């Protein structure tokens, strides 16, 4: 009878451990390829940045407008090889971003945070697709047109190994 109780206890414990094991994050490198199904299926090199809160996509000609009483944004992809295709998305919210220069303690000048439109955008990393909040800004002076911040990393159940690069396969969603 005691062996039966031990087996039952082990069975219950293994069931309890399953969600914990399933919650183990997927390990990605500091840089990964990410597809944007809603932006013409573009595949971009992205920087996985745990120090940034939100994701940012390089965009140009960013223009907000009203459609049926709701706030929308129209933009072009801001990458070297981008076409002139115009994309339109409903605005999820407006983010207020502090730039590094605004965080400089030696600078006594108080600057207003930059306001950026945020859209809900489908991203594909490896074979995982998630909808995440992405703010639109001109990142043309940066090496990577897409920055994936901590919120999006959580959506993907991701952890980042900064010593690795491009660990996921090319996007396949």
Predicted regions and their residues:
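Hydrophobic helical h-region of N-terminal Sec-dependent signal peptides
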Residues: 11-15
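N-terminal signal peptide c-region/cleavage motif recognized by signal peptidases
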Residues: 17-19
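Pepsin/retropepsin-fold aspartyl endopeptidases
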Residues: 22-173
């Amino acid at each position: 009878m005691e062996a039966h109780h031990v087996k039952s206890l082990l069975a219950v414990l293994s069931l309890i451990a399953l969600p914990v094991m399933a919650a183990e994050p997927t390990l990605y490198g500091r840089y990964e390829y990410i597809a944007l199904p809603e932006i013409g299926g573009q595949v971009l090199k992205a920087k996985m940045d745990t120090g940034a809160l939100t994701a940012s996509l390089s965009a140009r000609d960013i223009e907000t407008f009203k459609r049926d009483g709701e706030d929308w944004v129209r933009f072009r992809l801001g990458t070297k090889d981008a076409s002139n295709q115009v994309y339109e998305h409903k605005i999820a919210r407006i983010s207020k971003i502090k730039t590094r220069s605004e965080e400089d303690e030696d600078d006594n000048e108080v600057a207003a945070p930059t306001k950026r439109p945020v859209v809900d955008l489908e991203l594909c990393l490896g074979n995982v697709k998630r909808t995440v909040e992405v703010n639109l800004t001109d990142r043309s002076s940066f090496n990577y047109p897409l920055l994936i911040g901590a919120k999006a990393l959580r959506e993907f159940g991701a952890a980042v190994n900064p010593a690795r690069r491009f660990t996921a396969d090319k996007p396949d969603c």
